[in-house]
């Protein structure tokens, strides 16, 4: 019986020591491994908006070493060994749009390192209009290496995205609530 008590005490001591030696988990991008991740990829000091804009416009072929998932309220970054979470502005919502002719992919939260649209380097005209008729975007653009174009629009808005390209056009509706899609891959040009 005494041997069992000694064994139990030793096990408890090991658990206590292991717990004391572990590093705390953090989502603060300036602390620990999160800061290291940002530093290693040249993103230190950038806002989440700046990181998204830089990674989405990257000319690297997909998939990239650094991945990012754009959520309505945060950006989740990972390189396979470390992670960082950056908060997004409370009043803005990122819409990544991949117009297509023949093929697309299912996507809800835009993946900065793996999403690949069909139309790369193509001139398009993008219009984003609210249900009230306000034009949020009305411009010529060129799709990036990943086949997307991206826009920051007001959070809580809803409306229609229209893309024109080479005499073809497509439209889809959008909403920018807490669980809405940041990745628009259903806009087929016909």
Q: Which positions does each model-derived feature cover?
A:
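Mature extracytoplasmic domains of secretory-pathway proteins
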Residues: 91-135
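Short, acidic Ser/Thr/Gly-rich low-complexity loop/linker segments typical of extracellular
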Residues: 133-146
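Glycine-centered loop-to-beta-strand initiation motif
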Residues: 143-151, 161
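Extracellular beta-sheet/turn segments enriched in Thr/Pro/Gly and aliphatic residues
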Residues: 84-88, 93-99, 178-190
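C-terminal motif of bacterial Sec signal peptides marking the signal peptidase cleavage site
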Residues: 16-19
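Bacterial signal peptide processing site
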Residues: 21-24
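Bacterial N-terminal signal peptides that target proteins for export
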Residues: 1-10
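A short, solvent-exposed beta-strand micro-motif common in secreted/extracellular proteins
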Residues: 157-165
